[in-house]
């Protein structure tokens, strides 16, 4: 998994530039300035749940805790350019370890100093020839850096034989193993192979070398939702309605496949050339079974559901809370809970939420349903799942069949000049050298290698292949 978070030396500074900029964004009409509707959520939500949350579900999935602070997207611009430059320098210094074995990205190819292999997959069950269309690093030309995370970088690349443009996540095995994130990384790759939806970024290829893992995905160059929200301040309800409907459709698809995303936030939602949203970054996603709970602490603090914060186990209902926070942010310009990590977590569990009066009654009702502190009472958690959200009166104008056929056009389209356009990416990334930091070799024992059977090639008849091949 490549983390969506940059290293920050001073945690107390996290969120301050973000809060400052959003607070200066577009304001509602003067007649409602400062006039917020304070919800008595004890009436809506009922009393706080008891400490025991295991009555109906078995606790499962004992995983390492992964809690992100609000930061930039891996395949989009960062919040604040000057702040992201500072974080970028800190990240580079942290990752440039002194090691003997080196693999680097340079110019058109990726070179390993001691050994070159186009696809050094340690799959013992099948040879590369048995995987039709298998690719290696020599099949791609590296163009630009478009993101960086805890385990490596994200590049804009061109496939040499077709000239198609992709995003390539390059992740260091030594860092993944060191942080005990191998299971998250394997889950991300496995989950991406099972998804085919018009509003979810697709995995096209995956492979590995001795030192690194590679995920080759759709390159979505309209920027991420936060980038547009940052520039526009907040969205009109009609535009937010389309975006939210597309997000609901994507999350519903995941839940039908038995997958929780667990890190829904504007930085993980991209925009394509037509203005449609594209859900990305499945580094914290988890496959689940009904009537089981994940007992891990994971996600981005501002978007965590109360049950995750309490550490009492969570299920797919946690995603619907995050959708509610996303909608709140789209309509108001900022998430409902701000402050330090600890303060935000306290507010999530205990505080009332204030809804501005300028929002429609229907928007109020939907937010109340999604932001239920008790997961069993949350909209979308019932037997009909996402259908009760889709039938909500705020979505009355949405034709869901047309929406999922990409026939409902958002009123806003990002400025994109072509498939290779990087105008919607922060220059702190695109001006970065494509030279990658050194990487040491992980445990070479094949029995201990957690990355076997990593190679993947997406079949040609996927949804996005059909809809974008003629662009």
UniProtKB/Swiss-Prot annotation:
Can you cite an annotated GO cellular component? Answer: nucleus
Spans annotated as Activation loop: 281-307
Superkingdom of this protein's organism: Eukaryota
Please state how the activity of this protein is regulated. Activated by PDK1.
Modifications made to the protein after synthesis:
Undergoes serine-specific autophosphorylation. Phosphorylated at Thr-455 by TOR.
AGC-kinase C-terminal domain residues: 396-466
Region annotated Disordered sits at 1-21
**How are the domains described in the entry?**
The activation loop within the kinase domain is the target of phosphorylation.
- Tell me which family the UniProt entry assigns to this protein: Belongs to the protein kinase superfamily. AGC Ser/Thr protein kinase family. S6 kinase subfamily.
What does the annotation say about its assembly with partners? Answer: Interacts with TAP46. Binds to MRF1.
The name on file for this protein is Serine/threonine-protein kinase AtPK2/AtPK19
**UniProt gene name:** ATPK2
